[in-house]
């Protein structure tokens, strides 16, 4: 469809800059710009937010002891695997 438009000088400069920069025909640059400008707004999803939760180790629990136990269990599993491989 042919339509005559009167463009402001600054808009003409913007279009000409885009034509040269993108190496596309003026018709295509203007059509794409109008499509983007007139398209319905994209609904943005609300950003997922993780709320921190306060937690603490109960008194009387020894974290170093847990780490030591985990190390010992890991060592034991490795030794068992080595023995089975023989």
Curated annotation (Swiss-Prot):
It comes from the Bacteria. GO terms for biological process: positive regulation of growth. Keywords: Toxin-antitoxin system. Antitoxin component of a type II toxin-antitoxin (TA) system. Upon expression in M.smegmatis neutralizes the effect of cognate toxin VapC33. This is Antitoxin VapB33. It comes from Mycobacterium tuberculosis (strain ATCC 25618 / H37Rv).
């Amino acid at each position: 469809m042919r339509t005559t438009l009167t463009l402001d000088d600054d808009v003409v400069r913007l279009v000409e800059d885009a034509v040269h920069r993108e190496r596309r025909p003026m018709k295509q640059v203007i059509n794409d710009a109008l499509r983007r400008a007139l398209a319905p707004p994209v609904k943005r999803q609300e950003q997922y937010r993780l709320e921190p939760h306060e937690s603490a180790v109960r008194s009387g629990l020894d974290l170093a002891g847990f780490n030591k136990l985990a190390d010992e269990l890991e060592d034991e599993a490795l030794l068992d695997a080595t023995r089975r491989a023989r």
